[in-house]
From Swiss-Prot:
<comment type="similarity">
    <text>Belongs to the TRAFAC class translation factor GTPase superfamily. Classic translation factor GTPase family. IF-2 subfamily.</text>
</comment>
<feature type="region of interest" description="G4">
    <location>
        <begin position="492"/>
        <end position="495"/>
    </location>
</feature>
<feature type="region of interest" description="G2">
    <location>
        <begin position="417"/>
        <end position="421"/>
    </location>
</feature>
<feature type="region of interest" description="Disordered">
    <location>
        <begin position="93"/>
        <end position="288"/>
    </location>
</feature>
<dbReference type="InterPro" id="IPR036925">
    <property type="entry name" value="TIF_IF2_dom3_sf"/>
</dbReference>
<feature type="compositionally biased region" description="Basic and acidic residues">
    <location>
        <begin position="99"/>
        <end position="209"/>
    </location>
</feature>
<dbReference type="Pfam" id="PF11987">
    <property type="entry name" value="IF-2"/>
</dbReference>
<dbReference type="InterPro" id="IPR015760">
    <property type="entry name" value="TIF_IF2"/>
</dbReference>
<dbReference type="InterPro" id="IPR023115">
    <property type="entry name" value="TIF_IF2_dom3"/>
</dbReference>
<dbReference type="InterPro" id="IPR009061">
    <property type="entry name" value="DNA-bd_dom_put_sf"/>
</dbReference>
<dbReference type="GO" id="GO:0005829">
    <property type="term" value="C:cytosol"/>
</dbReference>
<feature type="region of interest" description="G1">
    <location>
        <begin position="392"/>
        <end position="399"/>
    </location>
</feature>
<feature type="domain" description="tr-type G">
    <location>
        <begin position="383"/>
        <end position="552"/>
    </location>
</feature>
<dbReference type="Pfam" id="PF22042">
    <property type="entry name" value="EF-G_D2"/>
</dbReference>
<dbReference type="GO" id="GO:0097216">
    <property type="term" value="F:guanosine tetraphosphate binding"/>
</dbReference>
<dbReference type="InterPro" id="IPR004161">
    <property type="entry name" value="EFTu-like_2"/>
</dbReference>
<feature type="compositionally biased region" description="Basic and acidic residues">
    <location>
        <begin position="231"/>
        <end position="246"/>
    </location>
</feature>
Amino acid sequence: MTDVTVKSLAAEIQTPVDRLVQQFADAGIKKSDVDSVTQQEKEILLAHLNREHGSVPNKLTLQRKTRSTLNIPSTGGKSKSVQIEVRKKRTYVNTPEAEQAKAEEQAQREAEATAQKIAEEKAKREAEEQAKREAAEKAKRQAAEKEKVTNQQTDEKTKPAQTDKARREAEAAELKRSVEEETRRKVEEDAKRVAEEARKMAAENEGKWPEPVAEQTESADYHVTTSQHARAAEDENDAKVEGDRRSRTRGGKATKQKKGNKLSESKADREEARAVGRKGKRKPSTLQQSFNKPVVAVNRDVVIGETVTVAELANKMAVKGSQVIKAMMKLGAMATINQVIDQETAQLVAEEMGHKVILRRENELEEALMSDRDIGVEAAAEHRAPVVTIMGHVDHGKTSLLDYIRSTKVASGEAGGITQHIGAYHVETENGMITFLDTPGHAAFTSMRARGAQATDIVVLVVAADDGVMPQTIEAIQHAKAANVPVVVAVNKIDKPEADPDRVKTELSQYGIQPEEWGGESQFINVSAKAGIGIDELLNAILLQAEVLELKAVRTGMANGVVIESFLDKGRGPVATVLVQQGTLNKGDIVLCGFEYGRVRAMRDELGRDITSVGPSIPVEILGLSSVPAAGDEVTVVRDEKKAREVALYRQGKFREVKLARQQKSKLENMFANMTEGEVSELNIVIKSDVQGSCEAICDSLEKLSTDEVKVRIVGSGVGGITETDATLAAASGAIILGFNVRADASARRVVETEGLDLRYYSVIYSLIDEVKQAMSGMLAPEYKQQIIGLAEVRDVFKSPKFGAIAGCMVTEGVIKRNNPIRVLRDNVVIYEGELESLRRFKDDVSEVRNGMECGIGVKNYNDVRTGDVIEVFEIIEIKRTIA
């Protein structure tokens, strides 16, 4: 036989050549695609594959459908026909044991057939030999008898003739021929009879021998009976069920039958009947076998996100929601079916119910989007300009100092002369470029100062030499320490006569800011923003500190940064001031910024000039975002705008879910506070501001004004002008509208006039907070104080038919007025509190009696007045309360 190559063998068995070569290698035979393969190597490969994969058991699936029609009687004496289709399916598996048994049975049948054939041939030969012997013996007997007769005739006739002798010879030959034919015919008939009997016996054996084989094959399967027996049993059962049904529908009592049927019902049927109730109808007969398939608990792979409702968790496990709630109650957690639970709780519940939990990270898309960025890893990091944040107390000269550095008039443009935004500027000096962030110093702008400290490299702490350390100065120190950034102290207003730089050093040393000359690490520079003293020294100190820090950044690759400030411009849309920290931001880049996304349509520097690209440590205004981002959000340049949109929408939904979950969460310790919440007055406010940072600062400041009696509720807040939507929201919620550096449009003013809303404009945050305090003070419940205005001593008691007991009194102090509340004191103990009903002097009714005069006093509904009692007259005074 010619050897075949590996390539031709692969084509013959329809498998790739590489895979066949690998299989030969796994079997210990090294082959290439052009090598030949012998029969022995084929057998080695086949044995290896059988060991590796095993032989697949042969399966045989039989399906059978039987259709029948049943006439079921119904109400009204009519019967209806119901088509019934019974589907049955059996699978027979040909296991190796069954194959071996079948082979043994086949060998046994072949051996028996061979033995039978040998027995038939032997019987045939014996029958033929017996027939020949019998025929020979018969012929001999006939010949002997004939010879005997012939001898007798010869003896009787001593003279036979020659003709008689010839005739006798002819008769003897004829007799011999007839005997031989008779013998041959009998032998053939006997052989045919024996062969027919052998065929009948073989046919009977073939009908008898397969029965035990079939029974063994059926018993090897998981079915109890053969298909014929099962069909007979099913037909018998169907006939029995139909007979029972007809016996029930005939109208007879059949109490024993009903009782037997009730006993034969399964537990599940009884529970279902109990769940339906007594009013439900009797469950109709299902006309099926009473065998119920055993139920096995299915363990599923449950995929759980960061949050999931109880109903969703039940659907994932394919169970009822009540079962999940029961499992949670066993674990000590109470929940409703629509309540949102966290990932850990859902994992505990699912594992308790026997399922496998797969925790899903819902921010996989975000991680994939962030990983697919060109961040310029191969490029070397270069030196970058330091980001310097100017911090300090309000009115200590931060903006004026920066104004002198930039040689512009920024401070004069701020309302009230105080900074209310974060200003981002970069300036070119002789020694390099510096980026400045100017933060507000007012107490309301805590979060804005914290944002400035997080995005900065160096903090310049401005302290007035004549004012010293103030509350916002301490807060700025805390922000700088929290951000772990070095501090350069600028002692401002050094040109004033009352300036005391040493006092500033002493006060700052108490908060961990030690001067270099005292052994510390902070540089103290004496400056004057008005006179320009020490400005160059301050810049050199900043650059020296930056050189020590060795600030570096990668200029190539996709940019990322932070939002310093954001606002809504009427003509340009959402505008965000971004400080680039890594990479290069180009016009047309796709950016993901917190909850917002977009393509950079335009970029402008702090002077309003259009630019196309910007590197690290440079602030820039970008246009093109989907909405106004929150200040402090991280800005990242990505590749795919569609994925950026999906990530932004996911973040918005996640923020909304967390917010709702936080609102729904009710703790036991807040129960009493929630019960008394209805007694608290609420001041609803709608706030619109020019920039996001100011809006956030105002909301925080107003919410801190809330007390136990008056609560400030921010109904709506946003960036941009006051629109008709804002006015409608304020009208629906009964809120006042506060505009900070923004104005209302015509449609909003029309709604304000129609609804009579309170609309106020502000440009300084001081005024806004003070007026909100006044509005809250007007909502406070007034305080009432009791002020004693007179005392009268009872000298005698008279009886009056109209008023009862009348006390004759002497006014010892103050004034006694009629219809005022009084107290009756006996031994300095209040025994009665009521109202002065009658006041007379010399039988005349008077409205008041002054000190040192006598009078008669009638107390309403009180007659137990005695001599020596003291009547105290007082009045209730309302005291107006204010918010501290």
